[in-house]
Regions:
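A short helix-loop-beta submotif of the ANL/AMP-binding
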Residues: 22, 28-56, 66-71, 189-190, ...
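ATP-dependent adenylate-forming carboxylate-activation enzymes
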Residues: 27-28, 48-64, 76-85, 170, ...
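Conserved pre-ATP/AMP-binding loop-to-beta segment of ANL
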Residues: 104-105, 111, 116-153, 160, ...
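Conserved AMP-binding/adenylation subdomain of ANL enzymes
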Residues: 170-190, 200-243, 257-259
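Conserved ATP/PPi-binding loop(s) of AMP-dependent carboxylate-activating enzymes
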Residues: 329-333, 344-378
Length: 378
């Protein structure tokens, strides 16, 4: 991985990318995506990964907001039985664009694509140039702790997408801390987060968290029900996965297929299960516990979001007790209270429970630093 990251870092340098430049990454869930992310970090470029399902207009909006000058993409990506024409979507997004200097295209599906002379280059050709030049080791660029590491745009469900900025040191310190402690990572564990690097879950718990701990991170391309509903369990069995971190929506979807897709797979390598992205209902929690964890794997129910950078509220596997449907308590160092709509701390129960708005009262290392180009929205 180190060699491949260095090689692609040199590709970026050869194509004019410098410290502080914004690089848009629009790729499928393949190793080259993680390599591109880490290569940007190595030379101090600010990566902005865009989820592979976004439309050309959504991409154009994000390119414009980030003032991006470089794009890394693929000819296509696989999603279920479909081939997604990523390069074609990028071409549409760039109609009228005046800022993009270079588009680097990685081969994945061998989909026919158009290549604009002077702008578009093939990943593989650029790697061959680096190998020929013998420039395969690139020293990491010195960075300030508060320099931006990446911009990640929220989905825009509450208006114009906002570019959440996370910093170099604080973000990586916190993703490492939460990965090691929440999942009780042990050397040689195989960690399988089923998320997408286009979202914060993939940034934090596919790329930066596991790799900063020297862990093995397993990436998944496609959907959990293709070619059949046993896809996750086949991966767990084949690669002897130790920790599985997935979304309640995926669990509920797989529940609908019954136990047939599970029965022919050996899940005994699993030690820890996790959920992310939304609350998990008790029925799904118990199904996950009984049929996937065989009632011997702690389930960590994690609460966090793009702006927090990493997990804030969760039980810690085998250390603190979990409860079906509850994220339980803030992690050590995280200070959380409930407040009413006027900001007053809630100290009395309502119908046996404390109810209010969650407020984190003290900063943590991965706190959002700003909203790119619009600090007032932060």
């Amino acid at each position: 991985l180190h060699l491949k990251v260095c090689q692609f870092a040199q590709v970026l340098l050869n194509n004019g990318v410098q410290k502080g430049d914004r690089v848009c990454i629009y790729m499928g869930m393949i190793p080259e995506l993680a390599i591109a992310v880490l290569a940007c970090a190595r030379i101090g470029a600010i990566h902005s990964v865009i989820f592979g399902g976004f439309s050309a207009q959504s991409i154009a909006d994000r390119l414009d907001d980030a003032k991006a000058e470089y794009i890394i993409t693929c000819d296509g990506a696989y999603r279920g039985a479909k081939d997604i024409p990523l390069k074609g979507v990028i071409d549409d997004a760039l109609i009228g664009n005046k800022t993009i200097k270079r588009v680097i295209v990685c081969t994945r599906t061998r989909t026919a694509v158009s290549m604009l002379k002077g702008r578009d280059v093939w990943w593989e050709d650029e790697i061959k140039k680096v190998e020929t030049q013998g420039l395969e080791l690139v020293a990491p660029v010195e960075m300030d702790a508060e320099d931006p590491l990446f911009i990640l745009y929220t989905s825009g469900s509450t208006g114009k997408p906002k570019g959440v900025v996370h910093s170099v040191a604080g973000y990586m310190v916190y993703t490492n801390y939460t990965f090691v402690n929440v999942f009780q990572y042990q050397p040689n564990d195989i960690f399988f987060c089923t998320g997408d690097v286009g979202w914060i879950t993939g940034h934090s718990y596919i790329v930066y968290g596991p790799l900063s701990a020297g862990g093995t991170s397993l990436m998944f391309e496609g959907v959990p029900t293709f070619p059949d509903a046993g896809r996750f369990w086949d991966i767990v069995d084949k690669f002897k996965v130790n920790t599985l971190y997935t979304a309640p929506t995926a669990i509920r979807s797989l529940m609908g297929f019954g136990l047939g897709p599970i029965k022919d797979h050996d899940l005994s390598s699993l030690k820890i299960l996790g959920t992310v992205g939304e609350p998990i209902n008790e029925e799904a929690w118990h199904w996950y516990d009984e049929h996937i964890g065989k009632k011997r794997c702690p389930i960590v129910d994690t609460w966090w979001q793009t702006e927090t950078g990493g997990i804030l509220i969760s039980n810690m596997a085998g250390i603190t007790l979990g409860k079906p449907g509850w994220a339980t308590y803030p992690l050590p160092g995280v200070k959380a209270i409930l407040v009413d709509d006027k900001g007053n701390e809630i100290t009395e129960k309502e119908d046996g429970l404390y109810r209010g708005n969650l407020c984190i009262t003290q900063p943590w290392p991965a706190t959002i630093r700003t909203t790119y180009g619009d600090h007032e929205r932060c």
